[in-house]
Swiss-Prot record:
This is UPF0173 metal-dependent hydrolase PAE2160. Gene3D superfamilies: Ribonuclease Z/Hydroxyacylglutathione hydrolase-like. SMART domains: Lactamase_B (SM00849). GO terms for molecular function: hydrolase activity. Belongs to the UPF0173 family. Coiled coil: none annotated. NCBIfam families: PRK00685.1.
Amino acid sequence: MQIKWFGHAAFMVEVGGARLLIDPWISNPLSPATPQDVINARPTHIMITHDHFDHMGEAVDIAKATKAPIVGTFELTLEVAEKGIPEAQTMPMNIGGTIKLGDGIELYMTPALHTANRGAPSGFVIATPEGTVYHAGDTALFRDMELIGELYDIDVALLPIGSVFTMGPREAAIATQLLRARRVVPMHYNTFPLIKQDPEDFKARVEAVSRAKVFVMKPGDVLKV
């Protein structure tokens, strides 16, 4: 399994024959890639945690070009249908639900403490034969992260640290502890001035409370698990 970061909250998780694109704001200021680069990579699924612009990004354009289905809350899939995505090309779900993609890959939708234009904000757990990834979406710290860790045995947690709109480094370090994740990648920071953070501060805080290994990625980097 490998995880590529495009900056902000945008990732591609590749495992087996699946290429799972998450929150594809590929035109974000930190991204070294273009939407066309991502189209050329042929994602098999597009997963959206909520419908704010910095998470929806170019999802609709990428879906139209690749025919990859969009996975999100029921309300979010209605929203993309209004933008020209056929209903058959959507995979609606809701918090607490599971979608099985085949080859042992399962998607679980988790809660997130945030807002959305339509529907509820969410996170995703991607469980695969090669490991389990948790993308928290935009969220504050919440106690049930401990339950998420107990249920899903997290190998890699992708956590926002930008503060202002999400949890910051202190809270994200506690989230790492609650999740009992083996590895953690900070995201959703330094994209614009309001969410400027030092990832090394986050790393130090994690190391003080957890055995998790922190991977501070640069946009374009790939983490192999």
